[in-house]
Amino acid sequence: MVTMTTLRASCCRLTGRTAAGRERGSSSIQMVILMPALFSIMFLGMQGALYYHARTVAIAAAQEGARAAGSQNGTAGDGISAASSFVSDAGGKDVLPGAHMTGSRSATTATVTVTGTSLSVIPGWSLAVSQSASVPVERITR
């Protein structure tokens, strides 16, 4: 004789089997959805690091160039040369591709600007970097 307990037990066994069967392949679908998101986050993090490194190199080169241009016998050309030398020593095109330096010197201030782009790990996305530094011109006082 079939009792209510045996019906309930067989029903739970059947639904347990079918529920487990419906979960088959779910980890593959989760990976298809999650892996591109994880890679995107990873590449954005690397892109941010490359941008800030290029920005740091640009400001350091601009400061170096401004110090050279602001020295007592310095010229704007000396500042541009010092900034260019700094960028090439820091990695050149591997750090700041398309680096361009401009400089000016007045009676009181020397300014050097370094512009370029950061390296890109995301295709079609290049970030411009522009940093400027100004220093007072050294002069002899008596």
Predicted feature locations:
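Alpha-helical assembly-interface signal, strongest on the long, hydrophobic N-terminal helix that forms
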Residues: V2-A82
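Short, conserved structural patches
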Residues: V2-C12, A76-R142
